[in-house]
């Protein structure tokens, strides 16, 4: 699963996920893309589950790019532990997603195969997404 190799600090504050994606919002590598319409967090497990769904559908053809990386640690306290005594330990990593962010890209397959693969992947994600085709000259 995806997670940072090293971090300057183990824990991070919660923060707020506001605004729209101004970077990483266009199809850059492949011919087709899966773009976020909604806002939220994607865990490393969700990113991997969607990748597997796409890979299984396109079989041996095509190439997939993952355009997001889970670099924010989410800490949790164990079950049935009283409040206080400091912040919990990092349990998993998430990627904060703004509307307009390109999540995955694909190339080397037909449009209908890519559309179906992205539909299967989108079912694994907690965000609303849309299918994008690269525009000529863009």
UniProtKB/Swiss-Prot annotation:
This is Large ribosomal subunit protein uL16. It comes from Burkholderia mallei (strain ATCC 23344). It comes from the Bacteria. PANTHER family: 50S/60S RIBOSOMAL PROTEIN L16, LARGE RIBOSOMAL SUBUNIT PROTEIN UL16M. The keyword Ribosomal protein applies. Binds 23S rRNA and is also seen to make contacts with the A and possibly P site tRNAs. HAMAP family: Ribosomal_uL16. Belongs to the universal ribosomal protein uL16 family. Keywords: Ribonucleoprotein, Ribosomal protein, RNA-binding, rRNA-binding, tRNA-binding.
């Amino acid at each position: 699963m995806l997670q940072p190799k090293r971090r300057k600090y183990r824990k991070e504050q919660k923060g707020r996920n506001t605004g729209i994606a101004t970077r990483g919002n266009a199809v850059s590598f492949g011919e087709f893309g899966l773009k976020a319409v909604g806002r939220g967090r994607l865990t490393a497990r969700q990113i991997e589950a969607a990748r597997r769904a796409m890979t299984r559908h396109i079989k041996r053809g095509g190439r997939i790019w993952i355009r997001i990386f889970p670099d924010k640690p989410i800490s949790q306290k164990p079950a049935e532990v009283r409040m206080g005594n400091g912040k919990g330990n990092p349990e998993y990593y998430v990627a904060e997603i703004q509307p307009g962010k390109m999540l995955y890209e694909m190339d080397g397959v037909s449009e209908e195969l890519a559309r179906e693969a992205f539909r299967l992947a989108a079912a694994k994600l907690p965000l609303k997404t849309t299918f994008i085709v690269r525009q000529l000259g863009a």
